[in-house]
């Protein structure tokens, strides 16, 4: 497991390669292969926009991998709407102790994910389907953590995510500056759905120029929810 030592502020001169080596450690070579894959196959297959290539390390690989700060050793993780594998694949590379399942409905994306996982020996399961489908819940449900990135508004995301985790499991939604606004707007609906202990946390503080903003919620028994 990697550890980030907060230094109270942004580094004066950010070195993305040094940051990547700190986060991915001995598995940096796999992370580099993923970077190259996204920059080539990912663009060609329409999984990543060409304008994103210059900032793949900062905005994508590292932005996702640092969420591992919120996940305990050996936990099971379901990544909903995984797309090109974000955040699931960076997490799997940085944290081989985790048991990760990538859920993706589109064929071209799920094929890409399966190819990368197999060719790089990652202990990751790829499930093609939508998170809300009963077959997906049966195959991937009961997880400790469910992750997502830029998938949907919080209320809809909770409807898809909460059934995939056990009681007291956690939903980790990577969000941007709108996180507080989304919580304020959807809090009542989230409570009815069984999402408790809502808060906003930052990951990668002192490591990334812009920390990753995560909305965190715990699945709580609905009978304890108050109207």
Curated annotation (Swiss-Prot):
Keywords: Cytoplasm, Methyltransferase, rRNA processing, S-adenosyl-L-methionine, Transferase. InterPro entries: rRNA_ssu_MeTfrase_G (IPR003682), SAM-dependent_MTases_sf (IPR029063). It is found in: Cytoplasm. Specifically methylates the N7 position of guanine in position 518 of 16S rRNA. Belongs to the methyltransferase superfamily. RNA methyltransferase RsmG family. Gene3D superfamilies: Vaccinia Virus protein VP39 (3.40.50.150). Its EC number is 2.1.1.-. It is an enzyme of class 2 (transferase). Its main location: cytoplasm. One of its GO terms (molecular function) is rRNA (guanine-N7-)-methyltransferase activity. GO terms for cellular component: cytosol. This is Ribosomal RNA small subunit methyltransferase G. S-adenosyl-L-methionine binds at residues 81, 86, 131-132, 149.
């Amino acid at each position: 497991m990697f550890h980030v030592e907060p230094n109270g502020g942004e580094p004066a001169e950010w070195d993305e390669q040094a940051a990547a080596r700190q986060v991915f450690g001995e598995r940096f070579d796999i992370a580099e292969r993923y970077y190259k894959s996204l920059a080539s196959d990912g663009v060609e297959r329409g999984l990543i926009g060409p304008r994103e290539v210059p900032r793949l390390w900062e905005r994508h690989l590292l932005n996702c991998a640092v969420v591992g700060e919120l996940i305990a050793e050996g936990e099971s993780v379901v990544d909903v709407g995984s797309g090109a594998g974000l955040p699931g694949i960076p997490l799997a590379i940085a944290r081989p102790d985790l048991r990760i399942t990538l859920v993706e409905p589109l064929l071209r994306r799920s094929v890409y994910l399966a190819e990368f996982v197999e060719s790089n020996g990652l202990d990751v399961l790829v499930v093609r389907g939508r998170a809300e489908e009963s077959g997906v819940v049966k195959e991937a449900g009961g997880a400790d953590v469910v992750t997502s990135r830029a998938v949907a508004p919080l209320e809809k995301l909770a409807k898809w995510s909460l059934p995939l985790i056990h009681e007291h499991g956690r939903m980790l939604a990577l969000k941007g500056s709108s996180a507080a606004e989304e919580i304020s707007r959807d809090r009542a609906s989230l409570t009815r759905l069984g999402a408790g202990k809502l808060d906003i946390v930052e990951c990668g503080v002192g490591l990334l120029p812009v920390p990753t903003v995560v909305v965190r919620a715990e699945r709580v028994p609905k009978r304890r929810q108050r109207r």
